[in-house]
Design a protein with these regions (language model features):
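Short helices/loops that flank or line small-molecule/ion binding pockets
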Residues: 65-79, 147, 163-172, 260-279, ...
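Extracytoplasmic/periplasmic solute-binding protein
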Residues: 126-132, 162-222
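Extracytoplasmic/periplasmic substrate-recognition and gating elements
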Residues: 285, 290-356
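Short, solvent-exposed loop/beta-turn-alpha elements that line the ligand-binding surface or hinge
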Residues: 100-113, 191-195, 212-236, 291-292, ...
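Conserved N-terminal structural module of periplasmic/extracytoplasmic solute-binding proteins
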Residues: 1-88, 108, 154, 427-436
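Conserved C-terminal helix/tail region of periplasmic/extracytoplasmic solute-binding proteins
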Residues: 16, 366-436
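Hinge/lid segment of periplasmic solute-binding proteins
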Residues: 86-142, 181-182
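Glycine-centered hinge/linker elements that transmit conformational signals in sensory
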Residues: 219-260
């Protein structure tokens, strides 16, 4: 495992070598961004744009795009940012540039007002980029055959799902396959597990808050106008506790949930040795599934249930930003944010591309999972029920530094400590914000 003190030098070395290679094979447009699944399909899209425009395009992956841009922005032309909360600081430093010129009157119909506000200045007059992909984390995954054996039950709320779980789980046959660890190196010390596992539980919490109380409460919570010790969040945490602190609900029990790789949830959902029916994972569950099974036939997902806010989605996404206004840069930028971007990618049989545009031609999808996810997200946007991952938007990185570690702690304890943990989170966040 790379020590934190050495991490900077590792990143610097990798980036230096990468850009040295680019220096020997000059490109007209250099895009920097994170590494991600199906990156090869993205490169194919870039090749199509290169043939169309005549410009040579390179994509360079970085561990920390924002950090790199603060120190090397002149070495790239475009950047993909996965956290919209980073855009304000980058724009204030004049690293990323306004993209208003590439929006039109009809743009409000292509992108929701909520999404545009996330990547705009505080007064919403300047827009810093375009959304190019979105992903849903509001999915209840299920084993198709086992779900049918239960009679394909429908749920109107997460509470109904919990009640059903309590009625139909037994000591040997928990209905849920759950695991939350995403650390690459095991075993880890307890304190190291926080950030590697708490983010998964935060996804559950965000979904329950949005499903039970709607976007207005969700937004206030993310802005710290509603605290963790307030009833809306306490009751949402309690819903999580009813599931994870009930040993018979979970395949192999809570200790397995805490210590096992998140990918185990997907594997166990299909594994013949288990009898679990459901799993709480986001879009990435599809990539964890064994190669010998298929979406729709062996596994599928339900939309996250809600009584008053049916169609809600908590998700994430990528924003493309401009670093200069060179003619080659702006030409490639326009192609990447056009309605046709991603059509070749969407046509792949295993595609996981989900366009952020409402006018994307969904007939291009040959993959049922990607198409269903696209429709889920677009429906939520039309209802103004799409909200971005809350832990990523919380001020001063408190979502990662405080929420994730505290939620991991909650999974190891019991509902008895619920209020204590909520108050602890509030105290730590208050202290963090005051110090800043």
């Amino acid at each position: 495992m790379v020590k934190p003190s050495h991490l900077f030098y590792v990143i610097l070395l990798v980036v230096t070598i990468t850009f040295s290679i680019i220096g020997y094979t000059p490109s007209d447009v250099v895009i920097v961004g994170p590494s991600f699944p199906q990156e090869n399909y993205f490169i194919e899209e870039l090749d199509l744009i290169s043939k169309k425009t005549g410009y040579k395009i390179a994509y360079v992956t970085l561990n920390d795009v924002s950090y790199y841009l603060y120190n090397n922005s002149k070495k790239a032309d475009l950047a993909i940012i996965t956290n919209p909360s980073f855009l304000y600081g980058l724009s204030q430093s004049e690293i990323i540039l306004p993209a208003n010129e590439y929006y039109f009157e009809s743009s409000s119909e292509i992108y929701s007002e909520y999404l545009l506000n996330l990547i705009s200045s505080y007064d919403n007059s300047i827009i810093y980029g375009h959304w190019i992909r979105l992903f849903s984390n509001s999915m209840i995954w299920y084993n198709v055959d086992r779900y049918k054996e239960l009679g394909s039950p429908k749920f109107n709320s997460f509470d109904e799902l919990i009640e059903y779980t309590e009625s139909y789980s037994t000591d040997k046959d928990g209905l849920w396959c759950l695991s939350i660890d995403s650390a690459e190196n095991q075993p880890l010390l307890d304190y190291e597990y926080g950030e590697s596992s708490g983010w998964i539980v935060s996804n559950w919490l965000e979904n329950i808050v949005l499903a039970n109380y709607g976007p207005e409460i969700y937004d206030k919570w993310i802005k710290n106008e509603i605290q963790f010790s307030d009833s809306e969040v306490i009751l949402s945490l309690l819903d999580i506790g009813k599931l994870i602190h009930n040993e018979k609900s979970i395949y192999k029990g809570k200790e397995y949930l805490i210590r096992s790789q998140v990918s185990s949830s997907a594997v166990n959902l299909i594994n013949e040795e288990s009898k679990c029916v459901f799993s709480l994972m986001g879009h990435d569950a599809n990539s964890y599934m064994p190669k010998n099974v298929s979406y729709g036939e062996d596994y599928d997902f339900l939309y996250f249930p809600s009584t008053d806010f049916t169609g809600m989605v908590v998700g994430i996404g990528d924003t493309l930003t401009l670093l200069n206004y060179d003619s080659s840069t702006t030409r490639v930028y326009q192609e990447l944010v056009s309605s046709s971007f991603g059509e070749s990618w969407a046509n792949k049989i295993n595609s996981e591309f989900v366009s952020a545009r409402t006018d994307f031609d969904d007939s291009k999808y040959s993959n049922g999972f990607a198409k269903k996810q696209y429709k889920q997200i677009q429906n939520s946007l039309s209802l103004n029920l799409f909200r971005f991952d809350g832990s990523m938007l919380m001020k001063n990185g408190t979502g990662k530094k405080i929420l994730w570690t505290s939620l991991r702690k909650f999974t190891t304890l019991s509902n008895h400590y619920l209020e204590e943990i909520a108050e602890e989170i509030d105290t730590r966040i208050k202290r963090e914000l005051e110090e800043k």
